[in-house]
């Protein structure tokens, strides 16, 4: 059976929604840019001491801007570029390849009905999110 990307994407969206999984993608480059801009502006206004103050203020602002931007994992999965979706599906397919399914609904039922399989799918999804996307996972509302 060829890898059916749409079915696996729907499975991942269902499983992550069922687990109430959210993630935040680390935007460290944006935070670093804000910190650098703060240091630069501080240096222009206050000289060498201004660099320290501006860097501290910019760093705090950068940290604040990049923290707590949690999005539901189904939304993140749907927004992935096709190449990353394919890579994620390949990872999950290694887990579900022995199953025989005809559509996404049947695949979801097969996985959700088997706790061991469901745990493996969730673990692979978390692994992909944390390793490939450098995401931080959160459960619940």
Swiss-Prot record:
Sorted UniProt keywords: Cytoplasm, Endoplasmic reticulum, Membrane, Mitochondrion, Transmembrane, Transmembrane helix
Domain of life per record: Eukaryota
Key word Endoplasmic reticulum present: yes
Signal peptide as annotated in the record: none
GO cellular component, one term: mitochondrion
Topological relation to the membrane, as annotated: Single-pass membrane protein
Location relative to the cell: Mitochondrion; Mitochondrion membrane; Endoplasmic reticulum; Cytoplasm, Cytosol
Transmembrane regions: 33-53
InterPro entries: C19orf12
Record PANTHER family: NAZO FAMILY MEMBER (PTHR31493), PROTEIN C19ORF12 (PTHR31493:SF1)
Similarity-based family: Belongs to the C19orf12 family.
Identification of the protein by name: Protein C19orf12 homolog
Species annotation: Xenopus tropicalis
């Amino acid at each position: 059976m060829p890898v059916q990307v749409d079915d696996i994407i729907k499975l991942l969206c269902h499983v992550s929604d069922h687990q109430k999984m959210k993630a935040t993608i680390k935007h460290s480059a944006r935070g670093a840019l804000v910190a650098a801009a703060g240091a630069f502006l501080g240096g222009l206004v206050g000289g060498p001491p201004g660099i320290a103050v501006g860097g501290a203020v910019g760093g705090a602002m950068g940290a604040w801007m990049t923290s707590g931007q949690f999005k539901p994992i189904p939304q993140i999965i749907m927004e992935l570029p096709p190449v990353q979706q394919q890579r994620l599906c390949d990872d999950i397919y290694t887990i579900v390849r022995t199953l025989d399914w005809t559509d996404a609904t049947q695949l979801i039922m097969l996985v959700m009905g088997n706790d061991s399989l469901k745990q493996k799918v969730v673990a692979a999804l978390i692994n992909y999110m944390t390793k490939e996307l450098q995401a931080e996972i959160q459960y619940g509302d």
